[in-house]
Amino acid sequence: MGFYEGDDNDANTKAFNDKYIKDQKFATAPFWNLFPKLRDIDEYDNPLLPLPFNFNFRDLGDSALAMASGIPTVKQFDKCEELKGQSAWTTQGIWKCLVPSKAIPPLPQLDFLLPLEEIKSDKSHSHGLFFNDFNLFLKWRSHMNRLQKQRIKTRTTAVEPLARTPEDLMLNWDDLHLGNDAEYASADGSKKIVGRAQSISTTKDSNDAKPSTVKTEKIYFDDGTVDITTTTTSKGSSPQVKHKVVSVDEDN
């Protein structure tokens, strides 16, 4: 169904979230997209929660601020009640009224009205993700904030200057390129890769003339974990491999 049910591991929800992040909608949504087109607003309509000043929403035209808080106006809510609709919120926190088919036809041409059955049957979220509880919307926003921070951290790690020695220069951009890792899953398919990072450094022990090369590979997953593999090699010795899984907060 087109509703978010609080499970970020649901296959359809994960696919929607991955595409949402990859398309950068979460980070770059235009400011005015936060507000709906309130074509039915007039000077007699008021916000459901009172404002500490007089305000005529009609003065703002088609892109009114009335819905910035995700709360309908009195007129909108009354219309929704009249049509036996139910409240829902979009991924941008915009309030909508989902109206059952018995109220159709004709469904009034108002921007905040949507057909309930069409949204409920939209399993692939082609019409977007909807929330029938504002707390679920806040939970989803929190989850998406973590994913966005994780991706930003991954990209920052990837583009940091890594070259320190001639050996380091062997690392090329292809090794660091993140591409569309959100489309790829872990080996067991339980979680998706959202980014990669790799670094190579050369160290030299003061008590040993032999330099050691340390290669660190990191894979970032959508559940907030990081798979870290460190391979240390030195001339005349077998490679030493260390592997661990940590949270993105523990990743230095």
From Swiss-Prot:
InterPro entries: Mpm1. Residues 230-252 are annotated as: Disordered. It is found in: Mitochondrion membrane. It is a peripheral membrane protein. It holds the Pfam family MPM1. Keywords: Membrane, Mitochondrion. One of its GO terms (cellular component) is mitochondrial membrane. It comes from the Eukaryota. This is Mitochondrial peculiar membrane protein 1. It comes from Saccharomyces cerevisiae (strain YJM789). The gene is MPM1.
